[in-house]
Structures are given as C-alpha cells and as structure tokens.
Amino acid sequence: MLTIAVSKGRIYQEALPLLAEAGIVPSVDPDKSRKLILPTERDDVQLVIIRAADVPTYVEYGAADLGIAGKDVLVEYEGEGLYEPLDLGIARCRLMTAGPPGRPVASRRLRVATKYVNTAKRFFARRGVQAEVIKLYGSMELAPLVGLADCIVDLVDTGNTLRANGLAPQELIMDISSRLVVNKAAMKMKYGPITELAGHLARIVSARAARER
C-alpha cells in the first residue's frame, strides 16, 4: 500500500487530473466527506488529506510514503528526510515581497510580516538587509496597512488581493510550483511501486508540457 499526502484546495484540485491519468481516483469526494483517509480505485494506493504545511512532516516521518507539496512549503520546512524527484508543474505562483506602491523595500532595516519566516530571513540576509520577521498565519495584506510591518512576504498569483488592499508586488523571491516528495526509507522499502508511480507521473508531466509548447 502506498500512502500519498495531499492538501485540500488548489493543489488538490490541480493534482486530481494528474493522479487520475496515473489511475489514482479517490473513491470518496473529500469536499463532501469528513474522511481524512481516502481510498482510491487502486487497491494499492490511498490518499491522506492534511494541511499543506504538514505534508513534508507526514512524509519525512513515514506517516505517508509520498506527498504533493508546494515548493514554498518545502523550502520553509528545511527537512532532510525527503527526496524531491519531480516538479509536477501545478499550482504555479510566485513568492514575493509586497508593500505599499511606490515605497521601495528598505535597504538596511525593516519589519516583515509572513508565514514564511525561514525563507524571508534567508532572502533579506542575502541582500544585507536587517529584517525583523513577524510570523502571521493569515491576512498578510493587513499588516502594512495598520503599521505592523513595512512589507510582507507571501504567495502571489494574479495580484488581485494585493491591489484590492492597496498593495503591490515588489521583489520576486522564487517561482513556485508543486512537487512530488518521497520518504527516504519508503524509497528503499517500496522502491518498485514508488519509482513506477513517479515515472508514470513524470511521463504525464512531460506530455502536458509538450502540448503547452
């Protein structure tokens, strides 16, 4: 049995067609069920539905053999018990700094609000900026508006939410997409089925990319 960890929301919705092409179709609709462990039409695969930030933890500690997680989560996690064999090319967006329009990011000292504390600290340290990073769990756009922070670090897709709150994207930290991650021990113990699934997904991703070119 292979257990795949995935989060509800955009990643799950964009992963569903990809998994379906690999023959992995949930037998239960997670939007209509309270079940967190979902059987699939394949007897050898099940899905566990968890918070996005918890996917790498479940995989690293062996509660799931594989997972689908955004690069933003993986970079912030800083774990060592994972392989990251495949960029699935889904849930694309950008991790950026953002703040009031026309106000450049300070060159020496500033206060930053984000849930990506580790990533933000590394980014500003590389730029030689002394940053006080404040961890928030949501409503990042509010922080600069009420004087809590000079800027934020957050995911940006269309930028509509930023604009609606009087903010603008500033600096790109990294492009984000969702990745397949694998538990290192499971890779040894279940090498055959894991590499077969990863290879199948890789072929699907390559075919999609070829169609989009």
Curated annotation (Swiss-Prot):
- Which UniProt keywords are given for this protein, alphabetically ordered? Amino-acid biosynthesis, ATP-binding, Cytoplasm, Glycosyltransferase, Histidine biosynthesis, Nucleotide-binding, Transferase
Catalytic activity annotated for this protein? 1-(5-phospho-beta-D-ribosyl)-ATP + diphosphate = 5-phospho-alpha-D-ribose 1-diphosphate + ATP
**Into which EC class is this enzyme placed?**
transferase
Q: Does the keyword Amino-acid biosynthesis apply?
A: yes
UniProt pathway: Amino-acid biosynthesis; L-histidine biosynthesis; L-histidine from 5-phospho-alpha-D-ribose 1-diphosphate: step 1/9
Q: Which CDD domains match?
A: PBP2_HisGs (cd13595)
Gene Ontology cellular-component annotations: cytoplasm
**What would be an example GO MF term here?**
ATP binding
Predominantly, its location class is cytoplasm
NCBIfam families in the record, alphabetically? hisG (TIGR00070)
The text of the family note is:
Belongs to the ATP phosphoribosyltransferase family. Short subfamily.
What does this protein's UniProt record list under function? Answer: Catalyzes the condensation of ATP and 5-phosphoribose 1-diphosphate to form N'-(5'-phosphoribosyl)-ATP (PR-ATP). Has a crucial role in the pathway because the rate of histidine biosynthesis seems to be controlled primarily by regulation of HisG enzymatic activity.
Q: What is known of its domains?
A: Lacks the C-terminal regulatory region which is replaced by HisZ.
Summary of subunit composition and partner proteins: Heteromultimer composed of HisG and HisZ subunits.
Q: What is this protein called?
A: ATP phosphoribosyltransferase
Q: Identify the species of origin.
A: Methylococcus capsulatus (strain ATCC 33009 / NCIMB 11132 / Bath)
